[in-house]
């Protein structure tokens, strides 16, 4: 019997109409099944060795992908804090998405618990999604199938940029100049809601809060600007925002034009506090700074 190759072990998420769609342009996935244990030793047990007892079961999954075209849909889904149906299965080697209904294939309900979007200079943009199961996993049926991925293009990180304002009253129109890296991380806090009324061993989780942060790293220019013609935020501007200690407006947008500084379609926007500003001066390397912004209130998806 041949060994299953990783490209033929895939995760699919419920989409429009209740159909399952594989995570497009996936580079890896992980499913974790966990027995939650409690120490069961007591004074009647002879010796010093532990004797754990299983008290509940839980599961989670993670998928990594080079596709960020669906960033808006994912940002909307995690913001809704509603569970979605997910499924994992072996897929056919002829197309890498037709389900084989393997013995280990399972489906269940899960919350989006973590989403990271990464847009780095001269790299393919990427995402990582994590989902936390709600209740049991069940075996898949013959009628459970995956829909194949759409034909999608890579998104280069240099064409997606962070724009900032100087306060929370005006639109963010100034790009972060000389940027090298940028990412957005969204997290949903989940709390154990399993009670004595819950049937079976599977843990029940419910969302309690949503938080997000944005991180960007940029080079420090010796004159603090790129050129006099560039409207961009430099390290001195970020220090002013830090000193003010009040929210500013931000947006992550696709860009075009000279030096990739003209915003076109907005992916996501909102307000944030500049939480930390770190300046780095390594020997024989370019000096840079990293700004971490903590989300203030809800974000908005799209323009």
Feature-to-residue mapping (PLM):
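Short loop/beta submotifs within extracellular cysteine-rich repeat domains
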Residues: 136-138, 298-301
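Solvent-exposed edge beta-strands and adjacent loop segments
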Residues: 1-68, 104-143, 151-222, 266-290
């Amino acid at each position: 019997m041949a060994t299953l190759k990783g490209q033929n072990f895939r995760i699919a998420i419920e989409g429009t109409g209740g159909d399952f769609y594989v995570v497009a342009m996936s580079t890896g996935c992980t499913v974790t099944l966990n027995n939650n244990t409690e120490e069961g030793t007591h004074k009647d047990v002879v010796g010093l060795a532990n004797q754990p007892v299983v008290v509940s079961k839980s599961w989670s999954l993670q998928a990594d992908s080079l596709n960020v075209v669906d960033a808006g849909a994912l940002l909307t889904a995690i913001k809704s804090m509603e569970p979605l149906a997910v499924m994992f299965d072996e897929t056919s080697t002829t197309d890498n998405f037709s389900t084989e209904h393997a013995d280990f294939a399972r489906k269940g309900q899960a919350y989006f618990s973590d989403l990271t979007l990464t847009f780095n200079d001269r790299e393919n943009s990427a995402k990582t999604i994590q989902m936390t199961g709600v209740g049991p996993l069940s075996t898949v049926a013959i009628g459970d199938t995956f829909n194949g991925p759409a034909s999608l293009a890579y998104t280069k990180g240099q064409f997606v940029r962070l724009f900032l304002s100087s306060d929370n009253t005006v639109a963010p129109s100034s790009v972060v100049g000389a940027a090298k890296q940028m990412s957005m991380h969204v997290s949903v806090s989940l709390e154990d809601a399993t009670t004595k009324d819950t049937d079976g061993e599977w843990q029940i989780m419910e969302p309690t809060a949503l938080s997000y942060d944005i991180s960007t790293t940029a080079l420090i220019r010796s004159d603090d600007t790129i050129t006099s013609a560039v409207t961009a935020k430099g390290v001195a501007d970020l220090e002013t925002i830090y000193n003010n200690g009040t929210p500013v407006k931000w947006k992550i947008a696709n860009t075009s034009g000279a030096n990739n500084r003209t915003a076109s379609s907005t992916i996501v926007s909102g307000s944030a506090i500049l939480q930390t500003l770190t300046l780095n001066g390594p020997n024989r390397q370019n000096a840079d700074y990293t700004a971490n912004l903590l989300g203030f209130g809800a974000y908005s998806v799209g323009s």
